[in-house]
């Protein structure tokens, strides 16, 4: 690749003879620098992912699908693809990471909603990412959200969203992954335990295992027994935060209720069990100094590297 810098032109000529340059030489030098600027700009643009969005509808809910894809030509087998829940928040982080690291070559797909209203997004995600849940097992005491849309949401992603993405981008069907955080992490584990063949890699960040009386553990037990009978290569990254965020305004009773709801096995416990399975790669990382929210950009980066570069953060604690 051509590199036009002062060094390539010769330091002595660049600094020591500028005053005696002829008009022609000055013109040539200006052209060289102009070409160099164009080249640098072209390289930067080549590393900038192509970001787009389009809307879909399923089960009476409007969705916005956010996409970041490499600007370069796809390999013969197609690009890997990573589907991400909470797309409004996660896709911009993933797109930025792709722009900073050209090795992260994949199509990133964030499933989100066509609104910037945070309360509306919270309401919708509570429904899409959860099984039907009794009110007394929901940590919200007022304006209790509707739950139970998980199965329909998975079918929407697995059939409609995948089909649309594959019609727009060259995708490698053997390298598909799912990422989720919090309730999205719970959804990722649900997909793994109930629809394992839908993706080859999974990343669950601070998964809400405690949700609905820890019903996900029954799914896990069934998955483990079935997997032992028919093992196949599978990959999972689980990460967790180390700090609990403050919850001002809650009464002692509410805090006690919340603590009871969130007790029980953790993501680390699930990873410890799954890594014992044949052909199952399960990695884990705990961010001791990060909260549930502050870990997000860090865990997105870890997940992309785990899925695309086979870089495992296992046994690392921060």
Enumerate the predicted regions with their spans.
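Non-catalytic cap/lid and distal C-terminal segments of serine-dependent acyl enzymes
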Residues: 47-318
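Bacterial N-terminal signal peptides that target proteins for export
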Residues: 22-32
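Ala/Thr-enriched low-complexity intrinsically disordered regions
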Residues: 5-7, 19, 27
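Sec/Tat signal peptide C-region and signal peptidase I cleavage site
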Residues: 42-46
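Aromatic (phenylalanine/tyrosine) cluster motif
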Residues: 14-15, 33
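Intrinsically disordered, low-complexity segments enriched in serine/threonine/proline/glycine
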Residues: 15-17, 21, 41
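Bacterial N-terminal signal peptides
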Residues: 32-41
């Amino acid at each position: 690749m051509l590199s036009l810098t002062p060094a390539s032109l010769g330091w002595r000529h660049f600094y020591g003879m500028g005053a005696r340059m002829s008009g022609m030489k000055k013109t040539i030098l200006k052209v060289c620098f102009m070409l160099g600027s164009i080249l640098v700009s072209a390289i930067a643009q080549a590393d900038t992912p192509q970001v787009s969005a389009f809307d879909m509808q399923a089960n009476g809910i409007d969705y916005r699908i956010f996409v970041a894809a490499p600007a370069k030509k796809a390999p013969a087998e197609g690009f890997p693809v990573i589907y991400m829940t909470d797309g409004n928040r996660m896709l911009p982080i993933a797109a930025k990471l792709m722009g900073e690291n050209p090795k992260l070559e994949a199509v990133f797909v964030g499933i989100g909603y066509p609104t910037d209203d945070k309360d509306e997004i919270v309401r919708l995600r509570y429904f899409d990412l959860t099984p039907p849940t009794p009110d007394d097992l929901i940590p919200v005491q007022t304006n209790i959200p509707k739950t139970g849309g998980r199965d329909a949401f998975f079918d929407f992603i697995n059939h409609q969203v995948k089909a649309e993405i594959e019609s727009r981008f060259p995708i490698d069907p053997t390298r598909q992954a799912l990422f989720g955080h919090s309730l999205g992490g719970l959804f990722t584990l649900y997909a793994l335990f109930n629809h394992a063949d839908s993706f080859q890699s999974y990343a669950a960040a601070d998964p809400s295992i405690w949700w609905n009386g820890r019903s996900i553990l029954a799914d896990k037990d069934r998955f483990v027994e079935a997997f032992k009978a028919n093992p196949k290569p599978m990959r999972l990254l689980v990460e967790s935060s180390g700090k609990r965020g403050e919850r001002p305004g809650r009464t002692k009773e509410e805090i006690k209720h919340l603590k009871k709801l969130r007790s029980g096995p953790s993501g680390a416990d699930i990873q410890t069990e799954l890594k014992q399975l044949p052909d199952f790669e399960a990695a884990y990382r705990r961010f001791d100094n990060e909260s549930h929210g502050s870990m997000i950009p860090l865990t997105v980066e870890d997940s992309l590297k785990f899925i695309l570069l086979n870089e495992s953060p296992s046994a690392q604690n921060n």
